[in-house]
Amino acid sequence: MKLSVYGKGGIGKSTTSCNISVALARRGKKVLQIGCDPKHDSTFTLTGFLIPTIIDTLQAKDYHYEDVWPEDVIYRGYGGVDCVEAGGPPAGAGCGGYVVGETVKLLKELNAFDEYDVILFDVLGDVVCGGFAAPLNYSDYCLIITDNGFDALFAANRIAASVREKARTHTLRLAGLIGNRTSKRDLIDKYIEAVPMPVLEVLPLIEDIRISRVKGKTVFEMAETEPSLLTVCDYYLNIADQILARPEGVVPKDAADRDLFSLLSDFYLNPPKQTTEAIAPEALLV
């Protein structure tokens, strides 16, 4: 099974991806996480350091694929999750999508691409150009990370449009949304009324999740010394269980940009009225 994780930049994709990868491993699956971001920090919380990238390794070998060994590019992370960082071209030059293609090509050359039960692509930002939409070509499911805000849902809608386009020629489906760092889901619910799709989980704003990123650890690893975090791990295990059940998924029908803008902005301009219970007149007497 191959998964692609997308979402607005800074929404917590890498932190979420790493914890989902560990959750899948806890369910007995052999997992490979591939970071598809020039920052090459997707797997930081799994390995605790910035691992060398595929592109760095290929450049050092003058792009002689036959001189590259699995141990040159695949690093073992926490929980037995294997990690790869695609890397990227220099800033302002080249195509990141090309790098993703080279990464898949190399892993196939190493006979590593088919050795895993689950491969998870963690893809940068919300700019789903043809290049960075490349992981969708290899994926069975797309997961979109969002919060309860306007910008993240607007980005989610653009990603949904990319999934719909890729699904024309690939067996790709949208598994659903994952709400992250949000105490509410009212705007998410408003969006999925207009654009029907599953919501796999909504994670509240938990400071320990943010801290885990800074520490270079997954929540699962932190829970080994802080048992109170086991309840947080359950969120990710729930997501893993839903994915492993191979959901039917959807081919989303994204909303037109202007329609979505009106829908989401109207939610803020004309918020739903709070319903309050009627107060008996005698209760007002002092």
UniProtKB/Swiss-Prot annotation:
Coiled coil: none annotated. Pfam families: Fer4_NifH. InterPro entries: NifH/chlL_CS, NifH/frxC, P-loop_NTPase, Protochlorophyllide_ATP-bd. Its EC number is 1.3.7.7. It comes from the Bacteria. Pathway: Porphyrin-containing compound metabolism; chlorophyll biosynthesis (light-independent). One of its GO terms (molecular function) is metal ion binding. ATP binds at residues 10-15, 39, 180-181. Its cofactor is [4Fe-4S] cluster. It catalyses: chlorophyllide a + oxidized 2[4Fe-4S]-[ferredoxin] + 2 ADP + 2 phosphate = protochlorophyllide a + reduced 2[4Fe-4S]-[ferredoxin] + 2 ATP + 2 H2O. Belongs to the NifH/BchL/ChlL family. Component of the dark-operative protochlorophyllide reductase (DPOR) that uses Mg-ATP and reduced ferredoxin to reduce ring D of protochlorophyllide (Pchlide) to form chlorophyllide a (Chlide). This reaction is light-independent. The L component serves as a unique electron donor to the NB-component of the complex, and binds Mg-ATP. This is Light-independent protochlorophyllide reductase iron-sulfur ATP-binding protein. It comes from Synechococcus elongatus (strain ATCC 33912 / PCC 7942 / FACHB-805). The lineage of its organism: Bacteria, Bacillati, Cyanobacteriota, Cyanophyceae, Synechococcales.
